[in-house]
Amino acid sequence: MLEMTALQAAGLWSGLLILVLVVLSVRVVMTRRRQRVILGDGGDEVMIVSARRFGNAAEYTPVAIGALILLALIGWQSWIIHLIGATFLLGRVIHPLGLAFGKGPPPARVVGMTLTWLPLLVAAGLLIVCPLVGMAPG
């Protein structure tokens, strides 16, 4: 991987996460056309799932982007930003696949959410605990 600063790494992962949101949004539009649902979900199960794929990503992604940027700004090394960003991105790619296989927690959905929550928890821990105990980033 190219050598980059922590802020550049945060920018890289933020850009990739934004692309995931765009892809999921386009899929919602395509589903709307296919299912002939103009507004809302129309009670259509396919439309509901498509909208939730996007909605779930839209709920978590801004938090992750903010955390990546804050970690970079306070001085964490780029490898930590890459690790958190890559893990979160992997979770955001896997999770919608799990929603494709009906109700209940299929393995892809569980793995996707685990890979979403884990980097968010690590980021939260670094942002909260380190300043409280005087631990320097890096």
Name what the model sees in each region.
Residues 125-138:
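Juxtamembrane boundary at the C-terminal end of a transmembrane helix
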Residues 1-7, 136-138:
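Short, strongly hydrophobic alpha-helical membrane anchors
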Residues 26-51:
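Cytosolic, membrane-interface loops and tails of multi-pass inner-membrane proteins
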Residues 94-121:
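Interfacial loop-to-transmembrane junctions
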Residues 13-16, 51-54, 84-87, 112-115, ...:
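Physicochemical signature of membrane-embedded alpha-helices that form the seven-helix bundle of GPCRs
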